[in-house]
UniProtKB/Swiss-Prot annotation:
Gene Ontology cellular-component annotations: ribonucleoprotein complex; ribosome
Function: One of the early assembly proteins it binds 23S rRNA. One of the proteins that surrounds the polypeptide exit tunnel on the outside of the ribosome. Forms the main docking site for trigger factor binding to the ribosome.
Provenance organism: Alcanivorax borkumensis (strain ATCC 700651 / DSM 11573 / NCIMB 13689 / SK2)
Domain of life: Bacteria
Family stated for the protein in its record: Belongs to the universal ribosomal protein uL23 family.
Keywords (A to Z) from UniProt: Ribonucleoprotein, Ribosomal protein, RNA-binding, rRNA-binding
Database matches in SUPFAM superfamilies: Ribosomal proteins S24e, L23 and L15e (SSF54189)
Keyword 4Fe-4S (UniProt): no
Gene: rplW
Protein name stated in the entry: Large ribosomal subunit protein uL23
Keyword set includes Metal-binding: no
Amino acid sequence: MNQERILQVLRAPHVSEKATVQADQNNTFVFKVAKDASKLEIKKAVEALFEVKVEAVRTANMKGKSKFFGRVAGKRVDWKKAYVSLAEGQDIDFLGAE
């Protein structure tokens, strides 16, 4: 996998209350990923970018919410979420604090 595709696969870390609990208790991190990304691509991208060992990847397709923009009804875009489980002793530090 080339460097350009690695950067396209992982969009951003997904920060939520559930994601924080998963990271603390299960050593599982949540990412927003490209809709066409496979589990193998996600695994390789995380291992290359963060230099960690990935044990498992689970994905979920999230449907965009219906919203009103003024009086006009609209819909947010659909997106894909990946739960990445790391090997024991591995960690990802998003903040870079030491």
